[in-house]
């Protein structure tokens, strides 16, 4: 696929602070230099509603991975870390899954994780993590705000606003999901 027809998209940020965990994402999907959709929902609740997830990358691939994670959560209820490690093993070793191009941030009341196609399952430092085209901007903004008196949601929203003002593949149509954290 030429660069003109490459799907670009998304910024996802997570913040864990003050007894809350938040994942926020924008709604833009771009094909080359064209915005194809401005209100895509890339942050959602999965499982029994006790896990929140946000994804960046190819949308169909991300949905496949979300479905697989939900199945792992059925196998390992209330064990997000275990379910994520098992998904990462499959993702790395399965011929079909290995070709999927997406990343995910997932969180429950106890843990926040980034899942990558290389089999990495990473926990954030300082309670913040971000992925996607504007991920570095959102991460820098969230880290700068984490020690302020702002709430987790306020930090996530501000980080997304900053990323949207810098990254052309990120818009300000922000979707936020929040859970009480342990």
Swiss-Prot record:
GO biological process terms on file: proteolysis involved in protein catabolic process
Record entry for activity regulation: Allosterically activated by HslU binding.
Subcellular location: Cytoplasm
EC number(s) given by UniProt: 3.4.25.2
GO CC terms in record: HslUV protease complex; proteasome core complex
InterPro entries in alphabetical order: ATP-dep_Prtase_HsIV_su, Ntn_hydrolases_N, Proteasome_sua/b, Proteasome_suB-type
Example of a GO MF term: metal ion binding
Function: Protease subunit of a proteasome-like degradation complex believed to be a general protein degrading machinery.
Family stated for the protein in its record: Belongs to the peptidase T1B family. HslV subfamily.
Key words, A-Z: Allosteric enzyme, Cytoplasm, Hydrolase, Metal-binding, Protease, Sodium, Threonine protease
Major enzyme class: hydrolase
Gene: hslV
SUPFAM superfamilies per record: N-terminal nucleophile aminohydrolases (Ntn hydrolases)
Domain of life according to the entry: Bacteria
Binding site for Na(+): 164, 167, 170
Substrates-to-products reaction catalysed: ATP-dependent cleavage of peptide bonds with broad specificity
Pfam families tied to this protein: Proteasome
Organism the protein comes from: Chelativorans sp. (strain BNC1)
Keyword Cytoplasm applies: yes
Name of the molecule in the record: ATP-dependent protease subunit HslV
Catalytic site: 10
Quaternary data: A double ring-shaped homohexamer of HslV is capped on each side by a ring-shaped HslU homohexamer. The assembly of the HslU/HslV complex is dependent on binding of ATP.
């Amino acid at each position: 696929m030429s660069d003109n027809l490459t799907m670009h998209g998304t910024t996802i940020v997570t913040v864990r602070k003050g007894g809350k965990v938040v994942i926020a994402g924008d709604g833009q999907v771009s094909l080359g230099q064209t915005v194809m959709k401005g209100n895509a929902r890339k942050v959602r609740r999965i499982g029994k509603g006790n896990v929140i997830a946000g994804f960046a990358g190819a949308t169909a691939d991300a949905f496949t991975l979300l479905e697989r994670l939900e199945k792992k959560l059925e196998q390992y209820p209330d064990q997000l870390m275990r379910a994520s490690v098992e998904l990462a093993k499959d993702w790395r070793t399965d011929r079909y899954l290995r070709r999927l191009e997406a990343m995910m941030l997932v969180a429950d009341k106890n843990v926040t994780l980034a899942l990558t196609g290389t089999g990495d399952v990473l926990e954030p430092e300082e309670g913040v993590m971000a992925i996607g085209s504007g991920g570095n901007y959102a991460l820098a903004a969230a880290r700068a705000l984490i020690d302020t008196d702002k709430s987790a949601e306020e930090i996530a929203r501000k980080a997304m606003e900053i990323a949207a003002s810098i990254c052309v593949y990120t818009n300000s149509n922000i979707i936020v999901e929040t859970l009480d954290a342990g």
